[in-house]
Curated annotation (Swiss-Prot):
<dbReference type="InterPro" id="IPR007454">
    <property type="entry name" value="UPF0250_YbeD-like"/>
</dbReference>
<protein>
    <recommendedName>
        <fullName>UPF0250 protein Lcho_4239</fullName>
    </recommendedName>
</protein>
<dbReference type="Pfam" id="PF04359">
    <property type="entry name" value="DUF493"/>
</dbReference>
<comment type="similarity">
    <text>Belongs to the UPF0250 family.</text>
</comment>
<dbReference type="InterPro" id="IPR027471">
    <property type="entry name" value="YbeD-like_sf"/>
</dbReference>
Length: 91
């Protein structure tokens, strides 16, 4: 797959940008993700988080929608989410 140059982003900024985050269904997971989202988007609405537990209840899928203002912001947000110890995958 070929990388798209930064100056040719397919995303128009600012825009509402949904991010799916999957992690262990443990106390504090939702709060940790909301805290990260708020650092990158101070207008983020914590009550807008969509939650989906796995069938067995071991994992929790979250969809957060942030206001994306730049590719750098999104890259940093993905890095921070992916690096969090409770997070298994970020899409």
């Amino acid at each position: 797959m070929q990388d798209i140059p930064r100056e040719q982003s397919l995303i128009e900024y600012p825009s509402a940008f949904p991010i799916k985050v999957m992690g262990a269904h443990v106390p504090g997971f939702l709060e940790a993700i909301v805290e990260i989202a708020l650092r990158f988007d101070p207008a983020f609405a914590p009550d807008s988080v969509e939650q989906r537990p796995s069938k067995a209840g071991n994992y929790l899928g979250l969809t957060i929608t942030v206001t994306a203002t730049s590719r750098d912001q999104l890259d940093a947000l993905y890095r921070e989410l992916s690096g969090h110890p409770m997070v298994k995958i970020v899409l």
